[in-house]
């Protein structure tokens, strides 16, 4: 029979072992191997049985064993040392504090940052993630902690976590949802001074109120607040709001996003009050999922500070960072406008919102407007609420500027104010212990964040590098065999049928990994375009390869499940099953061994649909060589020596033909470039040319792919400027915010009437030469704005056959006087910067010292 409800009972720890509680509930243990080794020493078999979960271990260990350890001097010495190390880690000055101590930087750095995401992949024991976004968010928190960045993270606590994947006998994905007991996880309940749970409330339509308690996961120095709606104070249907990650219909999803955004801000206010912390100055939203956080902050300023909507919006924009993680419109949450209006509007009919008291409902709805008037676009709302925005690789930044160009109509895509911060990965989480040990030996007292440390790899004997790679491949093969056996048994096989698994896969064979989510654009089955060719590669007598595949399809995506089934059916074939496997239930623990042990990491998305693709970074961090389409981060950092580029048939419109061409290129690379280099050995059995690629990969990519680099980029280029803007707008009783809001109102009112009446050019000789002086004069009607309210620019560049300016250069034009009828005169003289067919135009843009850029408001008038 099944239990109605599950809960966890923990054993009492002897007083001398009390430090185990702190070590087990701070998730820093998940990236600190000495702490993991300490827990393993309590009961090695139970540690494995509990899935390397310290909280579960302490709940299951025999009390007699704890009493024994309380008298074990060696164990107690290690415990005291690790407890002291954790306390030192939590309190000592780190990179962020060193920047503050530098003086000038202290004036720019925010006192706190709030980081919002719908998923967080911090550790296997807290399965609050589904894919790359969650793992990235987890790495962001861990690296922020390692750097001392004062971050508070906010998300939802999912009672079922993400699903467990298994396979049916015919290879079809089957999902089961674990029931997670928060009391059995490294979480603590946020309580007030009386010990009562702190609840946040959000008013929904029909007089319903959604309430949530707040679980706190301590990720090193960073608290992660997880909102949980499964409490008795909620009506039955509202208790299920946080049941599953990305589960349910759109009604369910919008409730989750309302709770994450509005409830998340209220959770931060409650947490900082209870812990007596300074409220965060900067708010970072990942995707539009938590977009409602910006509107809640507007409500706070309207209600508590007495600001009008526009002034409050100005303050919120100044201190908000928006990161887009998708390169396609289909990845954006778009709700029916009627649905959003139902949640936002108040039934009293006074135009004010019940969800966000004091705010006009029409202003809220307008923030999510897009070209389809029946839709509310969460990404558009996020961008309108943020003064700073970015994609997650250089290429993705370009793709995002084009995708959101409509919000800045009149600007070329390259001018859309969306930058980029290329993602990174958390080395202590993803690098194998062997590489971390080598890194410590090479670094000495220096930091692994410094590129010079990675250059010291030239000192290491190639045979030692190859020994590490071979050791990690052997570990992977053992893990693959165990997982393969378990999967076949779950699918109905018997032990008598599985003798072949003992010799499946070979620790000496070139090992290729492909593991990721299974949306169509990632092309899981590209490798199967020519099954006979793939079989030849797998079974080559001289240079065989072996292929390990893993990934989950969304439960509602039968197309993705069909792709998985194709791979499984091919891998089930007796002649190849010892060389290719699909491993079900891809998660962090499986991924880690894949990154460690695979020689080659395969990535073949449809370009440019991969926003970043951090799995390849994790492989590179372990000396794996990438074999990838030039997409995401690989487009940016591939240099010809750190892996291989799969040629992309970008101009081919026929998808089938494109797949055939790119699959053929993949097979050719494996057969003619990758395998020969791997199997070419010297007299010591070392593949010298391969190892030099491994060394080069570590030296050049190692410092770049670190999440510590990524977080520092965010601090320096986004968080610090946002904090400065916030202080300017919020200081002096919000006077600067009022001034900027007033300017924006005046500019938006005047802009449709602004006119460039005339443009005159003089000074050029009959045959213009490069460097010849061109004088431009523009006559402009400003419709009530002052000359210093605008920037007038001359724009010069090469022109194509349709007179479209290519790679334009802008030159600011000075105000030189007032003409007849109140028209203002602007002019400039500039040398011609280019040879060949050249053209020019003139445009007018807003100008205000509080704007991050002149294109921020999306206003422009062209001649």
Swiss-Prot record:
<keyword id="KW-0119">Carbohydrate metabolism</keyword>
<dbReference type="GO" id="GO:0005886">
    <property type="term" value="C:plasma membrane"/>
</dbReference>
<dbReference type="InterPro" id="IPR024517">
    <property type="entry name" value="Glycogen_phosphorylase_DUF3417"/>
</dbReference>
<dbReference type="Pfam" id="PF11897">
    <property type="entry name" value="DUF3417"/>
</dbReference>
<dbReference type="Pfam" id="PF00343">
    <property type="entry name" value="Phosphorylase"/>
</dbReference>
<comment type="similarity">
    <text>Belongs to the glycogen phosphorylase family.</text>
</comment>
<dbReference type="GO" id="GO:0030170">
    <property type="term" value="F:pyridoxal phosphate binding"/>
</dbReference>
<protein>
    <recommendedName>
        <fullName>Glycogen phosphorylase</fullName>
        <ecNumber>2.4.1.1</ecNumber>
    </recommendedName>
</protein>
<comment type="function">
    <text>Phosphorylase is an important allosteric enzyme in carbohydrate metabolism. Enzymes from different sources differ in their regulatory mechanisms and in their natural substrates. However, all known phosphorylases share catalytic and structural properties.</text>
</comment>
<dbReference type="InterPro" id="IPR052182">
    <property type="entry name" value="Glycogen/Maltodextrin_Phosph"/>
</dbReference>
<keyword id="KW-0321">Glycogen metabolism</keyword>
<keyword id="KW-0021">Allosteric enzyme</keyword>
<keyword id="KW-0808">Transferase</keyword>
<dbReference type="GO" id="GO:0005977">
    <property type="term" value="P:glycogen metabolic process"/>
</dbReference>
<keyword id="KW-0663">Pyridoxal phosphate</keyword>
<dbReference type="GO" id="GO:0008184">
    <property type="term" value="F:glycogen phosphorylase activity"/>
</dbReference>
<dbReference type="InterPro" id="IPR011834">
    <property type="entry name" value="Agluc_phsphrylas"/>
</dbReference>
<keyword id="KW-0328">Glycosyltransferase</keyword>
<dbReference type="InterPro" id="IPR000811">
    <property type="entry name" value="Glyco_trans_35"/>
</dbReference>
<feature type="modified residue" description="N6-(pyridoxal phosphate)lysine">
    <location>
        <position position="618"/>
    </location>
</feature>
<dbReference type="InterPro" id="IPR035090">
    <property type="entry name" value="Pyridoxal_P_attach_site"/>
</dbReference>
<dbReference type="GO" id="GO:0005829">
    <property type="term" value="C:cytosol"/>
</dbReference>
